[in-house]
């Protein structure tokens, strides 16, 4: 071990001695200074030694290689965003209220101005539906007449039950719209119908009384011939006894027997007549009852029809009243309204938007149309950059948002073809100008939404054309 250390020491000591001696004569070893012309006349290998090539080209080459290396590293490490562009516009969320008429109407009065702040239930417009007033007046008149008719039939039913005409009162509130002429007509009809029924009933009752009198006459004749037949029978018995004792002739017996037979026959005739009269009495009573039943049934049937008609007219009147109420438009919520009709006396059509009322807490959203080629890469929750076309984003900036909803049912667009509707929420509804002022955004402004669907490396982006060319090469159509 000691020998090895000694050898190492002597080795370094020898190098030290050589270096020291050379250091002493270092000035003698330097190349003498020569002029440029002298260097040019030296041999080629000495010229290269004395005047070596400049290091700048080599340095530039190294720098280029370093730049290419760094560019390669950056292209591998760095990533670019993949975005899908969708066009659309700013719009209020579904809480905005569109005011529309339910039918064609005329603008009678306008109580607000465009952009005015309104309170809930504040009067906005007064419309006049075409023919609504006339329809309502006609329905009221028809309903009033129907109520009078119903009262008429109800009074007649009471009169039939009581067999006398009750007091007719037409002063109730339900008859306040009826005219005096209609009331007089109803009183006349009630009295006329009741008296007509009473006359028919009286005629049948007279017929019944005649049948009753006829019955009494028949009964009297029956009693008469019952007594007469008994007397004639006793006489016949007595004459037969006398004939047996030879005290009278046979002719007297036969005569008496004939009288007895006549009395019995008359009694049988009147008894048969009694059955006929009793049948006529029953028929007369049934006719009296039938007249009352038919009269009552007719009244009930007409009353039923009248009640149904009254229900229909009440519904029609309610419908007309709703039309009148709907013609007076009030604010459903409070905040600013956008008036779209300004002409008093102008005509508005069914479902035409008259104004839009935006609640105070309403928010702006982006309604964008996603093209068919991009829909497969877009999901709810993805970030989006919103650029408002009205305000260049280089000066006013842009909005940030997120995809809120996507409708997976394609719609046909005349320029874009099949597109899908989407809603993108935004972080704010103002843009900042260069002077620092906040610019309020409004509904209807056109925007472009750049939806971030993913990332890819720069090298992948640069090589994608080559990759596509390679994948499509070596093929024959």
Curated annotation (Swiss-Prot):
<feature type="transmembrane region" description="Helical">
    <location>
        <begin position="60"/>
        <end position="80"/>
    </location>
</feature>
<feature type="topological domain" description="Periplasmic">
    <location>
        <begin position="81"/>
        <end position="477"/>
    </location>
</feature>
<comment type="similarity">
    <text>Belongs to the membrane fusion protein (MFP) (TC 8.A.1) family.</text>
</comment>
<keyword id="KW-0997">Cell inner membrane</keyword>
<dbReference type="InterPro" id="IPR010129">
    <property type="entry name" value="T1SS_HlyD"/>
</dbReference>
<keyword id="KW-0812">Transmembrane</keyword>
<dbReference type="Pfam" id="PF13437">
    <property type="entry name" value="HlyD_3"/>
</dbReference>
<dbReference type="GO" id="GO:0005886">
    <property type="term" value="C:plasma membrane"/>
</dbReference>
<dbReference type="InterPro" id="IPR006144">
    <property type="entry name" value="Secretion_HlyD_CS"/>
</dbReference>
<dbReference type="InterPro" id="IPR050739">
    <property type="entry name" value="MFP"/>
</dbReference>
<keyword id="KW-1133">Transmembrane helix</keyword>
<keyword id="KW-1003">Cell membrane</keyword>
<protein>
    <recommendedName>
        <fullName>RTX-I toxin determinant D</fullName>
    </recommendedName>
</protein>
<comment type="function">
    <text>Involved in the transport of the toxin RTX-I as well as that of RTX-II.</text>
</comment>
<feature type="topological domain" description="Cytoplasmic">
    <location>
        <begin position="1"/>
        <end position="59"/>
    </location>
</feature>
<keyword id="KW-0204">Cytolysis</keyword>
<dbReference type="GO" id="GO:0031640">
    <property type="term" value="P:killing of cells of another organism"/>
</dbReference>
<dbReference type="GO" id="GO:0009306">
    <property type="term" value="P:protein secretion"/>
</dbReference>
<keyword id="KW-0354">Hemolysis</keyword>
<keyword id="KW-0813">Transport</keyword>
<keyword id="KW-0472">Membrane</keyword>
């Amino acid at each position: 071990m000691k020998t090895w250390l000694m050898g190492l020491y002597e080795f370094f000591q020898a190098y030290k001695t050589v270096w020291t001696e050379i250091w002493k004569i270092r000035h003698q070893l330097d190349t003498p200074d020569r002029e440029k012309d002298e260097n040019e006349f030296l041999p080629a290998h000495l010229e290269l030694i004395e005047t070596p090539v400049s290091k700048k080209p080599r340095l530039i080459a190294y720098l280029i290689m370093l730049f290419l290396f760094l560019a390669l590293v950056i292209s591998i490490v760095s990533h670019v965003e993949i975005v899908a562009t969708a066009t659309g516009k700013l719009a209020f969320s579904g809480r905005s209220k569109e005011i529309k008429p339910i039918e064609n109407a005329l603008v009678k009065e306008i109580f607000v101005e465009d952009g005015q702040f309104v309170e809930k239930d504040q009067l906005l417009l007064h419309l006049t539906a075409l023919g609504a007033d006339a329809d309502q007046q006609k329905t009221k008149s028809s309903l009033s007449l129907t109520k009078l008719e119903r009262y008429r039939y109800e009074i007649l039913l009471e009169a039939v039950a009581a067999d006398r005409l009750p007091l007719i009162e037409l002063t109730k509130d339900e008859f306040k719209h009826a005219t005096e002429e209609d009331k007089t007509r109803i009183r006349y009809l009630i009295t006329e119908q009741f008296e007509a029924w009473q006359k028919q009933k009286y005629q049948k009752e007279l017929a019944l009384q005649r049948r009753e009198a006829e019955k009494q006459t028949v009964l009297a004749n029956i009693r008469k011939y019952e007594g007469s037949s008994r007397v004639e029978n006793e006489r016949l018995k007595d004459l037969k006894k006398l004939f047996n004792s030879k005290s009278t002739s046979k002719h007297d017996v036969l005569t008496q027997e004939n009288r007895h037979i006549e009395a019995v026959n008359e009694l049988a005739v009147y008894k048969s007549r009694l059955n006929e009269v009793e049948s006529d009495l029953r028929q007369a009573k049934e006719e009296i009852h039938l007249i009352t039943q038919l009269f009552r049934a007719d009244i009930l049937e007409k009353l039923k029809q009248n009640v149904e008609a009254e229900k229909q007219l009440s519904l029609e009147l309610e419908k007309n009243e709703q039309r009148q109420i709907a013609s007076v438009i009030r604010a459903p919520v409070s905040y600013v309204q956008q008036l779209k009709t300004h002409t008093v006396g102008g005509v508005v059509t069914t479902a035409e938007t008259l104004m839009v009322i935006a609640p105070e807490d309403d928010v702006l959203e982006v309604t964008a149309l996603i093209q068919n080629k991009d829909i497969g890469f877009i999901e709810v929750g993805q970030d989006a950059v919103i650029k408002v076309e009205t305000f260049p984003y280089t000066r006013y900036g842009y909005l940030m948002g997120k995809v809120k909803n996507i409708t997976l049912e394609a719609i046909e667009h005349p320029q874009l073809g099949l597109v899908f509707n989407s809603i993108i929420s935004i972080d704010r509804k103002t843009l900042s100008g260069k002077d620092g002022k906040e610019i309020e955004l409004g509904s209807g402004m056109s925007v472009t939404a750049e939806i971030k669907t993913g990332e890819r490396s720069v090298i992948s982006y640069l090589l994608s054309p080559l990759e596509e060319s390679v994948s499509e090469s070596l093929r024959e159509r």
